[in-house]
UniProtKB/Swiss-Prot annotation:
InterPro entries assigned: Lsm7/SmG-like (IPR044641), LSM_dom_sf (IPR010920), Sm (IPR047575), Sm_dom_euk/arc (IPR001163), Sm_G (IPR034098)
Entry's family note: Belongs to the snRNP Sm proteins family.
CDD domains xref list: Sm_G
Molecular-function annotations in GO: RNA binding
Protein's UniProt name: Small nuclear ribonucleoprotein G
UniProt organism field: Schizosaccharomyces pombe (strain 972 / ATCC 24843) (Fission yeast)
Domain of life: Eukaryota
Chain's gene name: smg1
GO cellular component: catalytic step 2 spliceosome; cytosol; nucleus; post-mRNA release spliceosomal complex; precatalytic spliceosome; SMN-Sm protein complex; spliceosomal tri-snRNP complex; U1 snRNP
Keywords noted in UniProt: Cytoplasm, mRNA processing, mRNA splicing, Nucleus, Ribonucleoprotein, RNA-binding, Spliceosome
Complex formation: Belongs to the 40S cdc5-associated complex (or cwf complex), a spliceosome sub-complex reminiscent of a late-stage spliceosome composed of the U2, U5 and U6 snRNAs and at least brr2, cdc5, cwf2/prp3, cwf3/syf1, cwf4/syf3, cwf5/ecm2, spp42/cwf6, cwf7/spf27, cwf8, cwf9, cwf10, cwf11, cwf12, prp45/cwf13, cwf14, cwf15, cwf16, cwf17, cwf18, cwf19, cwf20, cwf21, cwf22, cwf23, cwf24, cwf25, cwf26, cyp7/cwf27, cwf28, cwf29/ist3, lea1, msl1, prp5/cwf1, prp10, prp12/sap130, prp17, prp22, sap61, sap62, sap114, sap145, slu7, smb1, smd1, smd3, smf1, smg1 and syf2.
Subcellular location: Nucleus; Cytoplasm
Domain Sm: 4-76
Biological function: Plays a role in pre-mRNA splicing as a core component of the spliceosomal U1, U2, U4 and U5 small nuclear ribonucleoproteins (snRNPs), the building blocks of the spliceosome.
Length: 77
């Protein structure tokens, strides 16, 4: 069995990201931190509900086992 290292999200820190979560949940926010389990911290977050409604949720910590995908919304240089 191979050892998995920490996710390489350094290039996404302090950038606006889109996070797809299990249960068809979507969150947008600024990535402020993460750990080896893909637990992440977002600030200025907005949750997009299934019906399209957007709800400001501010700062949020998301457990890594809920994360399906993380995508930056800022242009990478």
């Amino acid at each position: 069995m191979s050892k998995a290292g920490a996710p390489d999200l350094k290039k996404y820190l302090d950038r606006q990201v889109f996070v797809q979560l299990n249960g068809s949940r979507k969150v947008y926010g600024v990535l402020r931190g993460y750990d080896i389990f893909l637990n992440i911290v977002l600030e200025d977050s907005i949750e997009e509900k299934v019906d399209g409604e957007k709800v400001k949720i501010g700062s949020v910590a998301i457990r890594g086992n809920s994360v399906i995908m993380i995508e930056t919304l800022d242009k990478m240089t």
